[in-house]
Curated annotation (Swiss-Prot):
The name this protein goes by in its record: tRNA N6-adenosine threonylcarbamoyltransferase
EC class (word): transferase
EC number(s) reported in the record: 2.3.1.234
Biological-process GO terms, alphabetical: tRNA threonylcarbamoyladenosine modification
Species whose genome carries this gene: Thermus thermophilus (strain ATCC 27634 / DSM 579 / HB8)
Cysteines engaged in disulfide bonds, as pairs: none
């Protein structure tokens, strides 16, 4: 049987992602990072992100096809992130992908960004139901995955996303952007941690909150306390918070399988904490934690294999799109 090739594109925020998947296996995963561009501003500037996507995307698609030894007409499916995300950035990749699908007369799949993250951590052959934690710079959501395309939101952040909190604390500490890897690196230098309170202990639900940790970090920075110990304390509290909420949900639902996806999933201390939790835990392969196009191609391939119909080309991109409605 002839192989099925899927092109996936993600421009939901500040990374231009292009991936190629062959029969559910990632063959090419290219990401054009805008970190240096936005670093001076301490965060993503939406208009600049959109302009950079316009520059990078055509070249990245051309390079991906060349690396796989493919011509555009060899593609079987084209997919792109429809949302959620920065609408200007989303439109660049989404419109480009729809144009390719139309020109090549190929099926087009509009993919939810968070379903892409879940697909990246979802091993082939793992049956649902299970829990999925998506923790990144823009999202911190805990889902019960009932099946492909069937998700139940258990809890979400009440304020900052986990990755956003890492970025903001990194800025307070005078570190680079994105802040997650920088805080992790600095925390590893500390022998002792300055204690931080773990948020929402004793709550009945499964929500998250990171704004209090950020405020605590600000007060400690103003006191001139050691930065490495501060970073370690913040990271330990943030990870403990994520773990406690997830473990409570696992106990209440009876699920023993957990997927951890999104950029924060690359944090080594977080990985160790969840591995010690007594659950069967799955993380994305190296390179698939951050935003990328390969995860979008994976999600589209799985939908295609399961008989989900392609998306109409008339369907527009959207900044707000609950995963439960995808």
């Amino acid at each position: 049987m002839r192989a099925v090739w899927v092109l996936g594109i993600d421009t939901s925020c500040d990374d231009t992602g292009v991936g190629l998947v062959r029969d559910g296996k990632v063959v090419v995963n290219l990401v054009a990072s805008q970190v240096r561009l936005h670093e001076a501003f301490g965060g993503v500037v939406p208009e600049l992100a959109s302009r950079e996507h316009l520059k990078a995307l055509p070249l990245l698609v051309e390079r991906a096809l060349a690396e796989a030894g493919l011509r555009p007409k060899d593609l079987d499916l084209v997919a792109a992130t429809r949302g959620p995300g920065l609408i200007g950035a989303l439109l660049v990749g989404y419109t480009f992908a729809k144009g390719m699908a139309f020109a090549l007369d190929r099926p087009f799949y509009a993919v939810h960004h968070l379903e892409g993250h879940i697909a990246a951590a979802w091993p082939e052959g793992l049956p649902p139901p299970f829990l999925a934690l998506v923790a990144s710079g823009g999202h911190t959501h805990l889902y019960e995955v009932l099946d492909l395309g069937r998700y139940r939101l258990l809890g979400a952040t009440r304020d900052d996303a986990a990755g956003e909190a890492f970025d903001k604390v990194a800025r307070l500490l005078g570190l680079g952007f994105p802040g997650g890897p920088e805080v992790e690196r600095l925390a590893e230098e500390a022998e002792e941690a300055i204690p931080f309170p773990v948020p929402l202990r004793g709550q009945e639900g499964y929500d998250f909150s990171f704004s209090g940790l950020k405020t605590k970090a600000l007060h400690l920075v103003e006191k001139g306390l050691p930065k490495a110990a501060l970073a370690k304390g913040f990271q330990e509290a943030a990870i403990a918070h994520l773990a406690e909420v997830v473990l409570k949900a696992a106990k209440d639902t009876g699920h023993r399988v957990l997927l951890v996806a999104g950029g924060v999933a690359a944090n080594r201390a977080l990985q160790e904490r969840f591995k010690e939790a007594g659950l069967e835990v799955h993380f994305p392969p190296r390179g698939l934690s951050q935003d990328n196009g390969a995860m979008i191609a994976l999600a589209a391939w799985r939908r295609h294999q399961r008989g989900f119909p392609p998306s109409p080309l008339s369907l527009g991109a959207t900044a707000y799109w609950p995963l439960e409605e995808a």
